C-alpha cells in the first residue's frame, strides 16, 4: 500500500508544477524575488511609494464552478477567480501586486488543472499582478473525481494618503456605473435552479446563437487597468464599489461613508437581455434580480459631476461603456430608486 493507491499522486503533483511554470513566469513583476516551488513567495514593494499600505483580499468563484465542470470548460474560471479578488482590492485605490491560488480537487487531472491555471495566469496578466504561488490539494474521498474548488488571495499596495475609504464622498457626487461582461461570478445558485426547475439545457440558445452555458460562463471583467489609468490621469475618484453578491443595493453603500446614500435611476443604463430572461423564465421579480445580480453594472465609481466626462472617455479607451446611474444624497447607507424585492 502507498500514498498513490490511496488516491494522492505526489509525482503527478510535481509534474504539474513544472507544466504550469511557463504560465506563472509570464505574470512576473520586477518586484518578485525568487521563483516557483519554494515554501513561500517573496515580493518587494514597488519603488516610489512614500507611505505604502498593503491591501489584501480573498474570494472564490462560487457555484459558477458547477457549470464549468458540467460543461467541461475550465479555461475561464481562473479569470473569474483573479477578477473577484483584484477588483475588491482595487476599490480602495490599490495597485494589485501579487496573487495566490488554492485549488482543491478529488484527483489531479493535468489537462483540466492546466486550463484552470492558464485562466488564473491570464487574469493576473490582465490585472498586472504576479502569480506568486499557490497550493493544489488532491483530496480523494472529500471531492469526487472531476470536482474542484478554487480560492484566491490578492495583495496590493496604495499610498496611505491616497486610500479611498468613503470619507472623500460628498453629497451631489455622481455614481458612474461601468458595464459588466455578464453575470460575473454571483447568483449562480439561482441561475442553476432556474435552469433545473424549468428543465432547460445549457446548450439552449434563447438569446441568439450563443448557448446559455457560454453566456453564463463569460468571465468576470477585470477593471484594474482602466481604473488605474483614470487615477493616474488625476481624475478625482472619491469612492469605488465592486458589484458582486447582493448587487447594487448591497455593495454600493460600502463605498459611500457615513451619512450618505445613493439614489439610482434604473433606466439610466441598458440592462442586458440575460437578466430580463432570467427574471421572466424564473418568475423572479425585478427587485429580486437587483438584489441578486449586477444587472449590467459590474463596478461603480463615485466622483464629482465635473469629472464624469473625462472618466467616461478614459474608460471608453479600454473598451468599457459607462453611464451616470445616480447621485449621492444624504442618508443612512441605502440605495434608493431601485425596484423593491
Swiss-Prot record:
Its main location: cytoplasm. It is found in: Cytoplasm. It is an enzyme of class 6 (ligase). The keyword Protein biosynthesis does not apply. GO terms for molecular function: ATP binding; phosphoribosylamine-glycine ligase activity; phosphoribosylformylglycinamidine cyclo-ligase activity. Disulfide bonds: none annotated. One of its GO terms (biological process) is 'de novo' IMP biosynthetic process. It catalyses: 2-formamido-N(1)-(5-O-phospho-beta-D-ribosyl)acetamidine + ATP = 5-amino-1-(5-phospho-beta-D-ribosyl)imidazole + ADP + phosphate + H(+). One of its GO terms (cellular component) is cytosol. It comes from the Bacteria. Its EC number is 6.3.3.1. Pathway: Purine metabolism; IMP biosynthesis via de novo pathway; 5-amino-1-(5-phospho-D-ribosyl)imidazole from N(2)-formyl-N(1)-(5-phospho-D-ribosyl)glycinamide: step 2/2. PANTHER family: TRIFUNCTIONAL PURINE BIOSYNTHETIC PROTEIN ADENOSINE-3, TRIFUNCTIONAL PURINE BIOSYNTHETIC PROTEIN ADENOSINE-3-RELATED. Belongs to the AIR synthase family. This is Phosphoribosylformylglycinamidine cyclo-ligase. It comes from Thermosynechococcus vestitus (strain NIES-2133 / IAM M-273 / BP-1). The lineage of its organism: Bacteria, Bacillati, Cyanobacteriota, Cyanophyceae, Acaryochloridales.
Amino acid at each position: 500500500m502507498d500514498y498513490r493507491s490511496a488516491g494522492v499522486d505526489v509525482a503527478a503533483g510535481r509534474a504539474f508544477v513544472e507544466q504550469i511554470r511557463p504560465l506563472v513566469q509570464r505574470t512576473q513583476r520586477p518586484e518578485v524575488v525568487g521563483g516557483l516551488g519554494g515554501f513561500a513567495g517573496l515580493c518587494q514593494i514597488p519603488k516610489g511609494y512614500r507611505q505604502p499600505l498593503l491591501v489584501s483580499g480573498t474570494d472564490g468563484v462560487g457555484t459558477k464552478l458547477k457549470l464549468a465542470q458540467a460543461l467541461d470548460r475550465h479555461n475561464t474560471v481562473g479569470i473569474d477567480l483573479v477578477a473577484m479578488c483584484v477588483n475588491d482590492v482595487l476599490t480602495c485605490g490599490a495597485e494589485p501586486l501579487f496573487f495566490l491560488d488554492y485549488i482543491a480537487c478529488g484527483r489531479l487531472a493535468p489537462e483540466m488543472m492546466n486550463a484552470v491555471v492558464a485562466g488564473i495566469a491570464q487574469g493576473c496578466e490582465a490585472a498586472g499582478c504576479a502569480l506568486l504561488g499557490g497550493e493544489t490539494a488532491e483530496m480523494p474521498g472529500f471531492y469526487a473525481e472531476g470536482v474542484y474548488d478554487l480560492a484566491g488571495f490578492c495583495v496590493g499596495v496604495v499610498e496611505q494618503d491616497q486610500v479611498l475609504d468613503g470619507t472623500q464622498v460628498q453629497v451631489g457626487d455622481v455614481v458612474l456605473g461601468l458595464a459588466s461582461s455578464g453575470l460575473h461570478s454571483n447568483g449562480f445558485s439561482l441561475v442553476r435552479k432556474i435552469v433545473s426547475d424549468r428543465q432547460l439545457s445549457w446548450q439552449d440558445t434563447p438569446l441568439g446563437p450563443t448557448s446559455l452555458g457560454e453566456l453564463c460562463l463569460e468571465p468576470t471583467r477585470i477593471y484594474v487597468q482602466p481604473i488605474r489609468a483614470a487615477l493616474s490621469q488625476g481624475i478625482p475618484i472619491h469612492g469605488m464599489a465592486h458589484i458582486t453578491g447582493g448587487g447594487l443595493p448591497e455593495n454600493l453603500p460600502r463605498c459611500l461613508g457615513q451619512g450618505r446614500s445613493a439614489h439610482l435611476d434604473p433606466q439610466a443604463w441598458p440592462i442586458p437581455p440575460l437578466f430580463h430572461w432570467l427574471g421572466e423564465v424564473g418568475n423572479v421579480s425585478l427587485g429580486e434580480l437587483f438584489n441578486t445580480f449586477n444587472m449590467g453594472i459590474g463596478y461603480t465609481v463615485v466622483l464629482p459631476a465635473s469629472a464624469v466626462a473625462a472618466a467616461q472617455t478614459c474608460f471608453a479607451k479600454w473598451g468599457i461603456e459607462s453611464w451616470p446611474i445616480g447621485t449621492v444624497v444624504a442618508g443612512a447607507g441605502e440605495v434608493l430608486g431601485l425596484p423593491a424585492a
